[in-house]
Curated annotation (Swiss-Prot):
It comes from Oxybasis rubra. The keyword Iron does not apply. Residues 37-49 have a biased composition (Basic and acidic residues). PANTHER family: 23.5 KDA HEAT SHOCK PROTEIN, MITOCHONDRIAL, SMALL HEAT SHOCK PROTEIN HSPF. It comes from the Eukaryota. It is found in: Plastid, Chloroplast stroma. Keywords: Chloroplast, Plastid, Stress response, Transit peptide. PROSITE patterns: SHSP (PS01031). This is Small heat shock protein, chloroplastic. Residues 34-55 are annotated as: Disordered. InterPro entries: A-crystallin/Hsp20_dom, HSP14.7/HSP23.5/HSP23.6-like, HSP20-like_chaperone. The gene is HSP23.
Length: 204
């Protein structure tokens, strides 16, 4: 009886040591693998969640369209300058358009203490096709030439409106020049001595 009890006890120890232990190891391995997958998926989720936020923060949805058509809506001079700053701060824009060379914007705007200067590429247009005017402190640039096909008409029609800060620019001193398909508009600024913020009133 004692020998049979010892054999049963030994058999139980073998079962617990030989069968359940590998199962325990197997469960531990599967758990680690599952946790590894969860961590990996979580990392992917984090990257996927972070990427759109970063892109939205650095580049608004209209950014790429603004680069090539900044005048599709009425804009202020400040908005144009901010757009230029964005382009200068992000030189990889050319690569994002599939070109290794510097991206040609087709437009440029500069401002200093003397004047505001705007350049716009208008290939295929002559100075007779371009009209520049100012209405209610808004600089209006329009161009349209006679075309033979509808495709050309769409490509060679241009219209823009730029709001000018009141009492800052000399409206009657604006100059426009069309040369080699490039329109250059210069808007001089009012000098301090020319400003008429103070009026002397004669006392009778």
């Amino acid at each position: 009886m004692a020998s049979m009890a010892l054999r049963r006890l030994a058999s139980r120890n073998l079962v617990s040591g030989g069968i359940f232990r590998p199962l325990s190891v197997s469960r531990s391995f599967n758990t680690n693998a599952q946790m590894g997958r969860v961590d990996h998926d979580h990392e992917l989720d984090d990257r996927s969640n972070r990427a759109p936020i970063s892109r939205r923060g650095d580049f608004p949805a209209s950014f790429f369209s603004d680069v090539f058509d900044p005048f599709r809506a009425t804009r202020s001079v400040g908005q144009l300058m901010n757009l230029m700053d964005q382009l200068m701060e992000n030189p990889f824009m050319a690569a994002s358009r599939g070109s290794g060379r510097a991206m040609r914007r087709g437009w440029d705007v500069r401002e200093d203490e003397e004047a505001l200067e705007l350049k716009v590429d208008m290939p295929g247009l002559a100075k007779e096709d371009v009209k520049v005017s100012v209405e209610d402190n808004t600089l209006i640039i329009k161009s349209e030439a006679e075309k033979e096909t509808e495709e050309e008409e769409q490509r060679r029609r241009y219209s823009s409106r730029i709001e000018l800060t009141p009492n800052l620019y000399k409206i009657d001193g604006i100059k426009a020049e069309m040369k080699n398909g490039v329109l250059k508009v210069t808007v001089p600024k009012i000098k301090e001595e020319e400003k008429k913020d103070v009026f002397q009133v004669m006392v009778d």
